[in-house]
Amino acid sequence: MLRSHAAGSLRSSDAGQQVTLAGWVARRRDHGGVIFIDLRDASGITQVVFRDPDVLKQAHRLRAEFCVAVAGLVEIRPEGNANPEIATGDIEVNASSLTVLGESAPLPFQLDEPAGEELRLKYRYLDLRRDAPAAAIRLRSKVNAAAREVLDRHDFVEIETPTITRSTPEGARDFLVPARLHPGSFYALPQSPQLFKQLLMVAGMERYYQIARCYRDEDFRADRQPEFTQLDMEMSFVDAEDVIAISEEILAALWALIGYEIPRPIPRISYADAMARYGSDKPDLRFGLELVECSEFFKDTTFRVFQAPYVGAVVMPGGASQPRRTLDGWQEWAKQRGAKGLAYVLVGEDGELGGPVAKNLSEAERAGLAGHVGAAPGDCIFFAAGPAKPSRALLGAARSEIAHRLGLIDPQAWAFVWVVDPPLFEPADDATAAGDVAVGSGAWTAVHHAFTAPKPGYEDAIETDTGNVLADAYDIVCNGNEIGGGSIRIHRRDIQERVFAVMGLDNAEAREKFGFLLEAFTFGAPPHGGIAFGWDRINALLSRVDSIREVIAFPKTGGGVDPLTDAPAPITEQQRKESGIDVKPEPSKPH
């Protein structure tokens, strides 16, 4: 070893010892003929002092981020010079030798000062020398170990599944890989290990897990990555309760790493209730502000805007004092979300209603409105009217925006909830509008994925009452973030083919795309279910950072670009030729 001790391990009890340290020059200070450096390695920082004339002469060349090895004597710092801010603050190392292991060019940014994200990602290897980014990556390693410990204790088998496979429709676009030895054909990078983990259940593995890399060629979104990680699990001979129980045990182990005990059992809410009360299928329960159903209240209204299939409201405490400019800003905020605007009523301190909507209401409506929605004098009532789904979504977004503007969210709080019993299907147009890829050509597509089982008792309604079929599925939400989603799977070929048919995949197309899975279901497939946790999002929450990029060693930007390697990049003509990427497949001959 080039060093005898880790820099952050030295204490006053080590005084008098000769040590050798290796690391980076975090800071250099010159004081009256003596040079001090803060020597940093992965364990922490130790102050090194250069007094010996020969070593001092060498130390004059040191600059920030030089990589060095230093030998010397551990000494107690002079009285008054201790630094209680660092663990090694009682001691310093009086250097007797110095070796420069690697010089550093002038830094593109100072490691102890803020820097732009693109610059940080371009020089990510420097960014990771900083305390916070390094701590996030190290915590991620502990998170992996904690999850594995729980799963190993429950006899799960860690199994790797293929990362180049067949392109199968799963709700997003595939990344395609040309198959050089089969010109005109392509592999796909997996969007998830979904099909393989189900096949492992057919294979009798019974309990599988994997910390899996997944790939989705999605449109650019602010906090998405084209490659991401999930903790993937599957279990045979289980129901939803079994999967939820072990999931809660894993989550408890993860949050214990940061000293938080998750209250168990984690509460549950149905998808329908979540949408009705919070306007979101991933509600943030750190604050109240529930939506109020107003359709019945306005059933006889003469106000045309409220003559709609759904009318709902959310109350902004103290919002009546907002200036007109701010209220106009809410209209722009709503329009950016695809709405025409955000109707509002102001409740005056005397209880009188104001604002443009109030004058369109009947006397009875004005008299009863504040009581119906729970508004007090000085509050602002925001409304949405129209089809229920987009109207609730708008109010749900307004609810979150109100909470942020009023500081109602405790940043130290944790609020977990299971969202259960979602619909099995949604209109394909809704999925497309949300940026997903509808599987099949039918009017309906799967809310989760095509392999989710209907809730027991709903099998007969798949074709006849498609929109009201519930899924045997469960999502775990933390602080308004979906951090995991799972379901009991279809394990019968006949039901799987019926689900495919509703989604517009006829038997021939289903066999062409998923024939291997359908065939596997004919060989005694067991009932099975599982869950996948969004590993990047969970790590971001545990590290208390806003972006998942902070917990990925080498992330892409929001635009899918890697500033470090400048990927993606064009390939050469030779590579195009060798890969067969431009080969047009022969048209298939009729039989």
UniProtKB/Swiss-Prot annotation:
Biased composition (Basic and acidic residues): 574-591
Site, Important for tRNA non-discrimination: residue positions: 31, 80
EC number: 6.1.1.23
Keyword annotations from UniProtKB, A to Z: Aminoacyl-tRNA synthetase, ATP-binding, Cytoplasm, Ligase, Nucleotide-binding, Protein biosynthesis
Reaction equation(s) it catalyzes: tRNA(Asx) + L-aspartate + ATP = L-aspartyl-tRNA(Asx) + AMP + diphosphate
Cited InterPro entries: Aa-tRNA-synt_II, aa-tRNA-synth_II, aa-tRNA-synth_II/BPL/LPL, Asp-tRNA-ligase_1, Asp-tRNA-ligase_1_N, Asp/Asn-tRNA-synth_IIb, AspRS_core, GAD-like_sf
Residue pairs linked by disulfide bridges in the UniProt entry: none
Enzyme class name: ligase
GO function terms (MF aspect): aspartate-tRNA ligase activity; aspartate-tRNA(Asn) ligase activity; ATP binding; nucleic acid binding
Residues reported in the UniProt entry to bind ATP: 216-218, 225, 482, 534-537
Residues where L-aspartate binds: 170, 216, 448, 489
Domain of life of the organism encoding this protein: Bacteria
Region (Disordered): 559-591
Function: Aspartyl-tRNA synthetase with relaxed tRNA specificity since it is able to aspartylate not only its cognate tRNA(Asp) but also tRNA(Asn). Reaction proceeds in two steps: L-aspartate is first activated by ATP to form Asp-AMP and then transferred to the acceptor end of tRNA(Asp/Asn).
Protein name: Aspartate--tRNA(Asp/Asn) ligase
